[in-house]
Amino acid sequence: METRDVLIVGGGVIGCATAYELSQYKLKVTLVEKHHYLAQETSHANSGVIHTGIDPNPHKLTAKYNILGKKLWLNTYFKRLGFPRQKIRTLIVAFNEMEREQLEVLKQRGIANQINLEDIQMLSKEETLKLEPYVNPEIVAGLKIEGSWAIDPVLASKCLALAAQQNKVQICTNTEVTNISKQVDGTYLVWTNNETTPSFKVKKIIDAAGHYADYLAHLAKADDFEQTTRRGQYVVVTNQGELHLNSMVFMVPTIHGKGVIVSPMLDGNFLVGPTALDGVDKEATRYITKDAPCMLTKIGKHMVPSLNINNALISFAGSRPIDKATNDFIIRVAHNDPDFVILGGMKSPGLTAAPAIVREAVRLLNWKLTKKPNWNGKYNLPWI
């Protein structure tokens, strides 16, 4: 059996970006994904935003990697890779004096997280409504932040994977890891449920398994960290020309997330959500509750009264993995095994942070790596 250098487990945006980064080195790399398609869990059902860094607490890894990740998207990934995206400002609206005070807290947090002063501005009620006339006139203030982007996270993941594949990374879908055993020679034997690729022998494992990152680490006897879930449900409202927004409009964030958003989508429709429900069973993170679409359209209409709730098109749900101990990213080697790299707790802003997270994952392999002389990091999906 051939020995692969690195096995990446998980084909979301984190796993695909890891494959892309590793594809530039002289390594034998395999990515396995249990679903038929890539990016079908957390990467499939989220707001699709490259965030400015307004929300994470500055002392957290989420803040550090948000800052670094956004720079890499803009300065490197966007220049090399072609997939749907659009620059769009963020507007957070306050409906009372307490929320207005929170906007000032967010502004100072954003400045601490390296948002340029000219890109972040407190707005009066009148300035907010001049900027976005369709926002509820009952608001008392707004916070405008320039520099965010809307992207399609599924197509971004696919683009990263195809770019990696053109540089000889092996991508195996329909391949779920069922067992892992560390051998006396220091390699791993990894078994899967795929008859075509039933097992792999590998030197290092990068755990990018999303909600199942803790399960995979336990399976390998590498670490005992634990995750919980935070399910978010969304509704898509069709745009029939009665409403125009130039910003992603957020409510003031809570401890559960960045707040409900009403945002133009890349296809011209509007995204409303998410909800936030903790502790949902891992197998139920994609389930829609009966009351969620009605609740979301009600909140969305409160934020933007012209939103036509009768135009609700579809609802969907996804979940963010939350590290129980830190409520932060986990980016480190496993406590019991230096050859097992954990990328866990990939909640928001995991999409924004992805390019920086995976560069750290490459560093954690602790190898002196040689770049391929003919590496081609450019790839364009056919999109309009």
Curated annotation (Swiss-Prot):
Lipidation, S-diacylglycerol cysteine type: C16
Disruption phenotype annotation: Cells lacking this gene do not grow at all in glycerol-containing medium, and exhibit a significantly reduced formation of hydrogen peroxide and a severely reduced cytotoxicity.
Binding positions for sn-glycerol 3-phosphate per the UniProt entry: S47, H51, K258, R320, S348
GO biological process: glycerol catabolic process
Leftover remarks: The reaction mechanism follows a ping-pong model; after flavin-mediated substrate oxidation, DHAP leaves rapidly prior to the oxygen reaction that reoxidizes the flavin and produces H2O2.
NCBIfam families reported in the protein's UniProt record: glycerol3P_ox_II
Protein's recorded name: Glycerol 3-phosphate oxidase
Recorded name of the encoding gene: glpD
